[in-house]
């Protein structure tokens, strides 16, 4: 099926029109519930006919969508409708009749002979076709949004002044060459200029026209539309750039060949000459009220009634066919179609003449204003189930459309009820949008310590790299709102310094981890809507303000909003290949860890019967925060992946979307970094489609055209095509289906080249068996249950589908729209912090000073201005340091004693009457403040003079003139006194330094006095004095020191250890120490783990010290109640059977026998359970031991499994005999396994 991405053609294809007429006739009397079946059956029957009249369902869908836009084209270029929404479907073009061809050629010659047409079309060879939607580079900006997702009409596609509006600067920006970027050219003779002029004027006279002179160099033929994606840079903020940013429009002209500049300039001059009278008439700036055009005025909302609409049944059938195409997923993006229908619902009739274009006879009714509104209302009524799946914010915006009342009252009430229910419902899994206190990545000892680096140099270098990274981030946060901020020039050198420190692979790995973790922290910023904050704002005015403020040139958030722009620019200016490679790996690892993790999984079928759960695994979802993190990771992973292949032209503009065969052949030889098809297929089989699909779509949307044609991407897209073609609302979870349809539809918008592949996939009838099987398994997991948890999906929907924000903007009611281009709101920026603070302080002080003092202040300022920079810096430094030191001195000598005295007086209050206590407290603290202020006035100036004198003595040379020294001291004293007085006022007098809520404090004092009185009346039996534990005969710290001394000597110098009696005495102290109650948990943990290590060292270093008494005493310590109750992590016995300990015992069978004796005693005494012991043995089976060691381990396990069966100690802990028997049985199995491992 030959196709081309165009909105519509001048002449619609005739076979499809005949089938539309036949279809309308056949479906007229079919019941509503059989429409879909008859509709599909009709095309199956037609598809078996002859080739001339053959029409597949896909061809018909392509034709119908294009014809629908063509029929309503008259409403695109005036203010009565929203921005035109062109179809993204490929138009199946058949050869028109001969008469039509002649007519088309005449019209083409007429258009091409007009200079105006050539100027407005910007070298576009198809002046009668509507511009194709442009391709953006990000998820937040829907492709083609310049032609769709905008709440104002786009009149730039109408073609010059003939489109119904006046001359503007935009008519010349595309064609007029930019002289600042031109190279010096050789002088062109007048003859050549004349030849070039004739060649440019006669370029469209026909295919047989030949140029009069040969160009100096060969120029490849190229047609560039001003709506193609070549004029938006890679990773730019939005797809609105071409329509809203004059600078980018002007840059797009640079890709024209320089040999055409003279011709373009001549055309511009001709255009000005032709429009001389019109320009003169538009010269006055002040336009009178009579001269205003209807489009410049704001009209009130007109009332409309759908009664008496002509051909109502015919229009209803058309809306039914349109609805069936949407239900069968024969439209690339269902949200795009909904936006188009809402626009049709809001159109108004200004009585303008209809656009002269071919309209199929079956759709002629849509050229009428009221018929168009009726058609849209019926379509929305048919798509009620789809509207109910929108999130609460989108539903609220949709219900703001006044013409939605044209729908049946029951439908509108159901939408309002559903919206209210969603707003009232709350779920514990909602995304936490509160501002987090964590702004930076915390230091983790296990990941960032010195042990994780090969040398001290790399460790020190990474600490410097970390500091430089955060300095760059802080600098960006302060300066990026400045209009003149330039990331490469201001932060590029700082980022270069990061890589200069070290590019060791370990450092790059840690830097990549830091980058990704900080990205996830910074991206989770508070983004509450006014509704969530409880603000009652005008939604229309708020939407307009958001359109102008959120980004520089877009009405919605850009591709990298807020702090994500810093990380994007950081990657863009990165000159380290090592960092980019490690960053790509880290992004993928984090993404896969979140995608495959089972920790955050939530199953939607928790309340379904057990037998139903066993039949299916899903569907599973993740928490909202996890989904948001995966989308961010996928976006940046795609950005880093495609960045080497997003080449730019010589002028800095991105290359047009051209599929280079050489590039495709070259990149086919290299295997991709990871298999997308395998990841998607595994998720579909495991019921994790709703987890993987959103981030996978985000990743695919970031890829370039060549990457999308690689084998792995093609296989992944075929799987998505199969899912999109087969997924339906019926018998499936509606919210899950909506998320899947919206994500895949958005991908087709983000990558318009994929639309042809989708329709070609639907048209084929063989070779998709494996895909169908996978899709059937996935859809089975999405089957609908009565008890499914819809609220979870409601919270996940706006995060998994962030493009709903653009959809909301597109359907927001707009009664006033002028040009379709948004103006900038220049952010009011502060000056440098020092200047702003000094100016504000000067203004405050100047307003309070007398004229004489103001004059004195001016003299001081003039004096400081006359001094050099070092002197001014000296005065500022001494002022700051003396101010802080005097504050500390005053706190120690004045404020703290004053507060202690006031607290002592409060403790002396004995009354229990609340009013009396409150009055006493007020008097006490009031006197304390007055006394503190009095002492502050008396002593602070002395403290200040003393500090100033000491500071100047240390900083100034001894030969400094006394007058100059006193001048410096006076300047410092004046500034410091002002700061001290401000600190006293804000931090003491107007703060809670002395007390908090005085009423609450009075209540506490009354309650305390009342309790004391009650206790005294009871005879003093309720004393709460601290009771110390009895003396145990030794110092605990001395005991711990002795234990550490034994461990140290046994490890290094066993010959220096004490005697066996000293060891027995140590264990007796341990038995007494663990019986002390209410000691810190770490104290018991040190004793228990220390004894474990002590017995290990005795086995390997001093086996003659180990006897039954030592083992029994150790078991009694481990069985103490304090150690049994402690839940320290790691546990006491975690290192009992370690790999290093077994390696040390490998050459000694006696060591294994002594270990067996210890473990048997521990099992019999109940110090350890058999199941816990099994867990300690399990890591040993991951090692490759020698047959001798395996034999000794097997014998050890066999003896332990037999020794503990008759023990009754495990009953004391509450364990059942069955569990203990199973543990011993498992130990026997481990013994057999260890004995037979050497045979494998």
From Swiss-Prot:
It is found in: Cytoplasm. Pfam families: Codanin-1_C. Changing residue 1069 to R: In strain: Oregon-R. Residues 128-155 have a biased composition (Polar residues). Keywords: Cytoplasm, Phosphoprotein. Changing residue 734 to T: In strain: Oregon-R. Regulator of cell proliferation and cell survival of differentiated cells independent of cell division. Essential for imaginal disks formation. Not involved in cell polarity. This is Protein disks lost. It comes from Drosophila melanogaster (Fruit fly).
């Amino acid at each position: 099926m030959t196709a081309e991405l165009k909105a519509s053609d001048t002449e619609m294809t005739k076979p499809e029109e005949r089938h539309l007429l036949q279809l309308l006739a056949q479906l007229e009397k079919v019941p509503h519930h059989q429409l879909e079946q008859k509709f599909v059956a009709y095309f199956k029957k037609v598809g078996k006919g002859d080739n001339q009249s053959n029409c597949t369902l896909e061809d018909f869908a392509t034709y119908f969508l294009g014809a629908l836009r063509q029929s309503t084209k008259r409403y695109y270029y005036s203010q009565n409708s929203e921005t035109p929404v062109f179809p993204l479907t490929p138009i199946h073009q058949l050869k028109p009749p001969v008469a039509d061809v002649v007519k088309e050629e005449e019209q083409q010659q007429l258009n091409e002979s007009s200079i105006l047409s050539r100027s407005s079309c910007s070298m576009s060879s198809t002046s009668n076709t509507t511009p194709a939607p442009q391709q953006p580079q990000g998820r937040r900006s829907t492709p083609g949004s310049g032609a769709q997702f905008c709440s104002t009409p786009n009149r730039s596609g109408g073609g010059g002044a003939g489109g119904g509006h006046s001359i503007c600067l935009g008519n010349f920006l595309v064609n007029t060459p930019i002289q600042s970027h031109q190279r010096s050219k050789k002088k062109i003779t007048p003859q050549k200029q004349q030849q070039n002029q004739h060649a440019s004027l006669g370029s469209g006279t026909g295919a047989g026209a030949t140029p009069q002179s040969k160009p100096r160099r060969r120029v490849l033929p190229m047609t560039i539309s001003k709506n193609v994606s070549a004029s938006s840079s890679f990773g730019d903020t939005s797809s609105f750039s071409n329509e809203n940013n004059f600078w980018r429009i002007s840059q797009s002209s640079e890709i024209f060949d320089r040999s055409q500049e003279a011709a373009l300039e001549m055309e511009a001059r001709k255009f000005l000459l032709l429009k001389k009278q019109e320009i003169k008439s538009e010269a006055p700036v002040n336009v009178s009220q009579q001269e205003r055009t209807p489009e410049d005025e704001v009209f009130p909302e007109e009332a409309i009634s759908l009664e008496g609409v002509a051909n109502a049944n015919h229009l209803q059938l058309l809306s039914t066919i349109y609805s069936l195409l949407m239900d069968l997923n024969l439209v690339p993006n269902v949200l795009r179609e909904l936006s188009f229908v809402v626009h049709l619902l809001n159109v108004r009739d200004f009585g303008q003449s209809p656009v002269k274009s071919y309209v199929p006879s079956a759709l002629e009714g849509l050229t009428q204003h009221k018929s168009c509104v009726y058609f849209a209302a019926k379509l929305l009524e048919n798509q009620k189930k789809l509207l109910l799946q929108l999130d609460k914010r989108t539903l609220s915006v949709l219900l703001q459309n006044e013409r939605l009342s044209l729908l049946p009252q029951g439908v509108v009430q159901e939408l309002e009820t559903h919206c209210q229910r969603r707003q009232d419902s709350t779920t514990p899994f909602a995304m936490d949008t509160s501002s987090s206190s964590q702004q930076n990545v915390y230091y983790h000892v296990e990941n960032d310590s010195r042990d994780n680096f090969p040398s001290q140099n790399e460790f020190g270098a990474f600490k410097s790299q970390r500091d430089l990274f955060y300095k760059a981030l802080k600098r960006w946060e302060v300066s990026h709102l400045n209009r003149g901020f330039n990331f490469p020039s201001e932060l590029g050198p700082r980022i270069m310094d990061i890589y200069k420190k070290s590019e060791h692979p370990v450092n790059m790995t840690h830097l990549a981890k830091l980058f990704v973790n900080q990205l996830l922290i910074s991206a989770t910023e508070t983004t509450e809507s006014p509704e969530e904050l409880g603000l009652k704002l005008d939604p229309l005015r708020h939407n307009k303000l958001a359109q102008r403020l959120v980004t520089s040139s877009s009405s919605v958030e850009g591709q990298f909003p807020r702090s994500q722009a810093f990380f994007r620019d950081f990657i863009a200016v990165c000159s380290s290949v090592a960092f980019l490679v490690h960053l790509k790996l880290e992004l993928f690892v984090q993404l896969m860890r979140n995608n495959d993790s089972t920790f955050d999984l939530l199953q939607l079928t928790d309340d379904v019967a057990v037998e139903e759960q066993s039949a299916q695994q899903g569907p599973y979802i993740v928490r909202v925060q996890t989904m948001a993190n995966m989308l961010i990771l996928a976006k940046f992973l795609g950005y880093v992946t495609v960045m080497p292949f997003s080449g730019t032209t010589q002028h800095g503009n991105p290359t047009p979307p051209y599929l280079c065969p050489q590039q495709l052949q070259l990149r086919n030889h290299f295997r991709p970094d990871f298999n997308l098809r395998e990841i998607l297929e595994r998720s579909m089989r495991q019921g994790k489609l709703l987890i993987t699909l959103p981030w996978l779509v985000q990743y695919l949307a970031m890829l370039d055209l060549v990457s999308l044609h690689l084998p792995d991407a093609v296989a992944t897209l075929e799987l998505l095509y199969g899912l999109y073609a087969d997924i339906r609302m019926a018998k499936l979870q509606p919210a899950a289906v909506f998320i899947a349809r919206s994500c895949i539809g958005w991908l087709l918008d983000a990558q318009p080249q994929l639309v042809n592949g989708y329709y070609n996939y639907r048209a084929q009838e063989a070779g998709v068996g494996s895909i169908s099987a996978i899709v059937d398994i996935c859809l089975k997991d999405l089957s609908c249950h009565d008890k499914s948890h819809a609220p979870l999906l409601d919270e996940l929907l706006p995060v998994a589908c962030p493009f709903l924000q653009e959809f909301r903007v597109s359907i927001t009611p707009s009664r006033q729209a002028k040009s379709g281009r948004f103006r900038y709101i220049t952010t009011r920026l502060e000056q440098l912090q020092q200047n702003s603070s000094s100016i504000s302080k000067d203004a405050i002080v100047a307003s309070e000073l007398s004229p004489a003092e103001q004059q004195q202040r001016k003299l001081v300022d003039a004096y400081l201005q006359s001094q050099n920079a070092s002197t001014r810096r000296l005065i500022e430094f001494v002022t700051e340091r003396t101010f802080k030191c005097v504050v500390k001195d005053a706190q120690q000598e004045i404020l703290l004693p004053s507060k202690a005295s006031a607290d002592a007086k409060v403790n002396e209050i004995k009354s229990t009457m609340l009013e009396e206590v409150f009055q006493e407290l007020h008097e006490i603290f009031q006197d304390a403040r007055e006394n503190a202020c009095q002492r502050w006035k008396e002593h602070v100036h002395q403290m200040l003079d003393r500090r100033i004198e000491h500071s100047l003595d240390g900083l100034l040379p001894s030969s400094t003139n006394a007058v100059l020294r006193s001048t410096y001291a006076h300047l410092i004293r004046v500034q410091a006194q002002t700061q001290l007085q401000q600190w006293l006022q804000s931090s003491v007098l107007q703060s809670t330094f002395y007390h908090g809520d005085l009423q609450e404090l009075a209540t506490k004092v009354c309650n305390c006095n009342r309790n004391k009185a009650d206790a005294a009346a009871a005879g003093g039996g309720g004393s709460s004095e601290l009771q110390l534990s009895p003396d145990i005969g030794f110092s605990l710290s001395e005991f711990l020191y002795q234990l550490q001394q034994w461990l140290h000597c046994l490890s290094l110098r066993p010959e220096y250890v004490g005697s066996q009696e000293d060891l027995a005495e140590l264990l007796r102290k341990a038995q007494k120490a663990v019986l002390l109650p209410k000691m810190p948990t770490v104290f018991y943990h040190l004793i228990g783990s220390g004894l474990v290590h002590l017995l290990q060292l005795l086995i390997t270093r001093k086996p003659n010290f180990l006897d039954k008494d030592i083992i029994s005493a150790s078991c009694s310590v481990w069985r103490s109640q304090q150690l049994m109750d402690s839940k320290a992590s790691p546990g006491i016995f975690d290192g009992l059977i370690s790999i290093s300990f077994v390696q040390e015992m490998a050459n000694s069978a006696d060591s294994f026998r002594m270990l067996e004796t210890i473990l048997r005693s521990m099992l019999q005494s109940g110090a350890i359970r058999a199941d816990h012991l099994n867990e300690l043995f399990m890591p040993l089976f991951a090692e490759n031991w020698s047959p001798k060691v395996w034999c000794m381990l097997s014998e050890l396990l066999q003896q332990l499994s037999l020794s503990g069966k008759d023990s009754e100690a495990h009953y004391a802990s509450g364990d059942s005999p069955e569990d203990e028997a199973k543990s011993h049985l498992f130990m026997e199995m481990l013994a057999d396994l260890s004995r037979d491992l050497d045979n494998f």
